[in-house]
Regions:
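Catalytic glutamate of the conserved HExxH
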Residues: 192
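SF2 helicase/translocase NTPase motor core
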Residues: 57-61, 66, 85-94, 144-158, ...
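Short, flexible coil/linker elements and helix-boundary hinge sites characteristic
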Residues: 26, 55, 76, 92, ...
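Residues that form generic nucleotide/phosphate-binding pockets
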Residues: 49, 53, 70-74, 90-100, ...
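Conserved phosphoryl-transfer catalytic core
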Residues: 81-109
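Accessory N-terminal region flanking or inserted into the helicase ATPase core
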Residues: 2-5, 16, 32, 103-189
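P-loop NTPase Walker
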Residues: 1-80
Length: 192
């Protein structure tokens, strides 16, 4: 059964979902319940509320987290193996194309933040499982971007990641899905 709870912030969506978690906890091992949120802050808030409400420990609820956190932990990824701002800056200097990139947000949600349409196009293409050229041809970007520069940057990012054994947040999710390493759940809650 699929239930969708909609509403703006502060309207009780998380409380409603935790009430549903309560129903499942009566007959379901907490290790078989996944509760995923977009931000680490929201995932921890839900976990902490569940710990208090259901008299559990944090360890009892290992799958109250973000999807990126689940992938990171399950695959045994180290932070130094994930593309950071310094890597984009280094690559930009090497190819003489400014790669304006901001760190992933402080909530560790995997939100990619940049003012660069080149990087945005590449990221959207990866998320949609299409080529950067196809994403470019959709004309969803706002700045003047040359297809030539886009393809150079896309190829150079992949080469850089390979050379330095790095992945980005999208790679993390892709590798997780392909690994078939996901825990088996009886029920999953998505608090987005």
């Amino acid at each position: 059964m699929k239930t969708i709870v909609l509403g703006p912030p502060g309207t009780g969506k998380t409380t409603t979902l935790l009430n549903e978690v309560d129903k499942y906890l009566k007959n379901t091992d907490p290790n078989r319940i996944g509760y995923f949120s977009f931000t680490q802050k929201a995932a921890y808030e839900a976990r902490d509320r569940a710990v208090e409400k259901f008299n559990l420990t944090e360890d009892d609820l290992p799958y109250f987290r973000t999807l990126h956190s689940l992938a990171f932990r399950t695959l045994g990824i180290k932070k130094e193996n994930v593309m950071q701002k310094k890597h984009y800056e280094d690559l930009g200097k090497k190819i003489n194309i400014r790669l304006d990139y901001h760190e992933y947000d402080n909530e560790y949600s995997g939100i990619f933040s940049t003012n660069s349409d080149i990087l945005r196009i590449i990221q959207l293409a990866k998320l949609r499982s299409i080529t950067p050229e196809r994403q470019y041809n959709l004309k969803e970007h706002t700045q003047d971007v040359s297809l030539r520069d886009l393809l150079i940057v896309s190829n150079e990012i992949e080469a850089y990641k390979k050379e330095y054994n790095l992945i980005d947040f999208t790679d993390m999710i892709t590798q997780f899905v392909l690994s078939d390493a996901s825990p088996k759940f009886d029920v999953v809650f998505i608090d987005e």
